[in-house]
Regions:
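Bacterial Sec-dependent N-terminal signal peptides
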Residues: 1-24
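Aromatic (Trp/Tyr) and acidic
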Residues: 23-110, 114, 144-179, 214-231, ...
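Long, well-ordered core segments of solenoidal/helical folds
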Residues: 47-79, 116-132, 187-204, 235-251, ...
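Asp-box/WD-like beta-propeller blade repeats and closely related beta-sheet repeat scaffolds
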Residues: 139-160, 170, 186-211
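Solenoidal tandem-repeat scaffolds enriched in leucines and small polar residues
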Residues: 200, 212-253, 271
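C-terminal beta-rich recognition modules with glycine/proline-rich loops and embedded aromatic residues
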Residues: 236, 304, 370-378, 383-480, ...
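Flexible glycine/proline-rich, aromatic-decorated loop/lid segments
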Residues: 257-261, 315-334
Length: 674
């Protein structure tokens, strides 16, 4: 796709967005689209390139090999037998098309574009005349998949995933339209969305259901933005409002019996705790933010504010993962954050990024980007290997030789029977530049840091912003501001919470020995006074071409301790430097990590290892290791060097032990791990 076409599509997107915003309210802050940011860094750009060259082709290949594509062919022919396991397997194709569309916006690829068109033709052929699209039924309506039910929609709340499939179709269609300007997938999505809106809604002549797996709400909002069809937004809001009205057993502790697994235990506006399936929840909260922004419904906003506070103060892991329980892939009770059995589905981390970005656009507070960054740099990208074709479904915080948890993954896999996470990765990675900047009137927010060149428009004037840095390894940040002509506006540079001695925006985690170092800022080489507003350094002035802002974020090695209510982390400490949480892995630590202790006062120093794990800063120092003799009767402690690597980089060198939370005393060591 040439630049002229790309610019035309971008203008079309802006026009559509503005037409919708003119009809109703919207987010007060708007993200700068990822196509306006050209990366030139050594951290994200290689990952985005690998996603384009390896992850997306591998994902499409697996969809072919496993029969996901064949299901569409059979649905078109109305013959055969559904040949994969789950009725939501259709979405792996949709999500990969979405990711590929994002990638096409960055890397024009005629061959990839043609392949996507071939897939879209198959999807179109599988769609029924009234817009219904669900291969698990259409292949053989008289004998559909067992989760589908004997007729359309009848098992939607429980397990059919019909509306879940539709939601991912909508998101893929919007992404493809914006990337290519083609309507082939968008028209399929419109026919399906029109059907959904005609079937579901208020009134005795329509069906009433709380969708079994949220995402259709987010998809309908995106369709509304593109088409301006108000019924899409209304139906998204309606689906959210259907929750909490089904006759469950409120006295039951079983999440499937009381409705909490589906977040269906209370009306959404009355919910104040993150509960149930973590991915479903994250998509719901993101959709609630969308609806709050677009309708001005304060009740939605109040609810997600309360839920966010619950997650950040009681239910998020130190590396940004959410969803502690493998049983139902759910949030656990408050402060229940086990390490060895941590589930932390990669999809849940992705949903958490979506939700926190929306919370930022509602409130303009950097604390939401702090959480987004924590998830993004740690518990999310750990979900994809550096080769681009191996994945974690779950993201554990501790592996011991004695580990036996059934959900624990100690190595990545190329694919899964339920492969929602790999295909979700394909669409998240290329969208990362879209989280870097945002605008509100004459305010330009800088949220994430990566060497790049960006073009934005402020008060109808073009402004080029060039970032130069080696983030996340180095805290020296340089911003070159180049307006087309002198222009007054406010530059809002995020000063991360970790650079202000805050481990997380709650008391769930704290730095045990906060550094006295503070962020510093210069303008054109001279120190400048600035004020902090909601976590942002605010520089308001008339900017001229060639202005340079330099920021130094202190990258001290910090010891992190958990709230005393987190029993699994009692007497233990985690290590963080900048946005990165660190772990010890067996290859660097004499084959063991479960026996390492980090007494108070141990100093760890950063050291760049260019040839290790695609280039990382490791932390080294003198720790101690506990050993037990062969008879199990004598314990000894020996001085031992420790090497810690970024958490995201573990499990690239074979199976073995890994530790995030280190005991500070011998009494906290698990002596049964040998």
């Amino acid at each position: 796709m040439d630049n002229k076409l790309r610019n035309t599509i971008f203008v079309l997107f802006l026009c559509l967005s503005f037409s919708v915003r003119a009809q109703l309210k919207d987010y007060p802050i708007q993200g700068v689209t990822f196509t306006q940011v050209k990366l030139d860094d050594k951290f994200w750009l290689p990952r985005i390139e690998t996603n384009h060259k390896v992850t997306i082709p591998a994902s499409f290949a697996r969809c072919e090999e496993t029969g996901r594509v064949k299901n569409f062919d059979m649905a078109a022919a109305k013959s055969g037998k559904f040949c994969t396991v789950y009725p939501f397997d259709d979405t792996d194709i949709y999500k990969t098309i979405e990711g590929a569309s994002f990638s096409l916006s960055l890397y024009p690829d005629k061959k990839l574009s043609q392949y996507i068109d071939t897939l879209i033709m198959k999807v179109a052929a599988a769609q029924e005349p009234d817009g219904y699209l669900y291969t698990a039924r259409t292949i053989n309506p008289s004998a559909p998949h067992e989760w589908a039910g004997p007729e359309r929609w009848i098992l939607e709340r429980d397990k059919s995933h019909e509306l879940y499939n539709s939601g991912h179709l909508y998101e893929a269609a919007v992404a493809h339209f914006l990337a290519t300007g083609q309507r082939n997938l968008l028209d399929i999505a419109i026919r399906n969305a029109d059907l959904v809106c005609s079937v579901f809604g208020p009134g005795s002549d329509k069906r009433h259901v709380a969708p079994g797996h949220q995402v259709v709400e987010m998809g309908l909002v995106k369709m509304y933005r593109i088409t301006g069809k108000k019924e899409y937004l209304a139906t998204a809001k309606y689906f959210l409002e259907q929750r909490g009205h089904h006759p469950y057993d409120a006295k039951s502790n079983n999440p499937w019996m009381n409705g909490s697994y589906w977040q269906d235990h209370k009306p959404v506006v009355d919910q104040d705790e993150a509960i149930g399936h973590a991915v479903r929840a994250g998509y719901q909260y993101a959709a609630m933010a969308d609806v709050a922004a677009l309708t001005g419904d304060e009740k939605f906003l109040k609810a997600i504010d309360a839920i966010w506070n619950n997650v950040v103060s009681k239910k998020i892991y130190v590396q940004g993962g959410v969803g502690a329980l493998g049983d139902g892939e759910r949030f656990g009770d408050n402060y229940y954050l086990p390490n060895e059995s941590a589930y932390n589905e990669t999809c849940a981390a992705i949903a958490n990024v979506y939700w926190n970005h929306r919370m930022f656009m509602l409130h303009g507070d950097s604390k939401y980007i702090d959480i987004l960054e924590k998830s993004l740099y740690n518990g999310l990208i750990s979900g994809v290997g550096m080769d681009g074709k191996s994945f974690f479904y779950t993201n554990v915080l501790e592996v011991k030789n004695s580990s036996h948890d059934q959900h624990q993954e100690s190595s990545r896999s190329g694919w899964f029977t339920c492969s929602c996470c790999p295909t979700n990765i394909t669409r998240l990675i290329p969208s990362v530049p879209g989280y870097m900047y945002a605008q509100q009137g004459d305010k330009l927010y800088v949220n994430l840091f990566a060497s790049s060149k960006s073009k934005v428009t402020i008060n109808k004037k073009n402004v080029e912003v060039i970032q130069s840095n080696n983030y996340p390894w180095d805290g020296d940040l340089k911003f070159s501001i180049n307006p087309a002509s002198s222009l007054p506006f406010s530059l809002m540079i995020r000063i991360p919470g970790w650079a202000q001695q805050q481990a997380i925006p709650s008391d769930l985690y704290t730095f045990s020995n906060p550094s006295s170092s503070k962020a510093s800022l210069t303008l054109n080489g001279k120190p400048v006074e600035y004020k902090i507003e909601k976590g942002y350094a605010v520089l308001t002035r008339t900017w001229k071409k060639g202005d340079v802002v330099s920021v130094n974020l202190p990258m001290d090695v910090q010891r992190v301790v958990a709230n005393a209510n987190v029993k699994d982390d009692a007497g233990r400490v985690a290590i963080q430097r900048g946005p990165l949480v660190y772990c010890a892995e067996w290859p660097d630590n004499s084959g063991r990590t479960a026996n390492i202790i980090l007494p108070q006062g141990i100093a760890l120093k950063p050291e760049l290892k260019k040839d290790l794990l695609n280039g990382v800063v490791v932390l080294t120092g003198d720790a101690a290791a506990v050993t037990v003799d062969a008879l199990g009767t004598t314990i000894s402690t020996v001085k031992q060097p420790i090497v810690a690597i970024p958490y995201y980089a573990w499990a690239h060198r074979g199976k073995g032990e890994m530790t995030v939370w280190f005991p500070e005393k011998v009494t906290s060591v698990d002596l049964n791990s040998k």
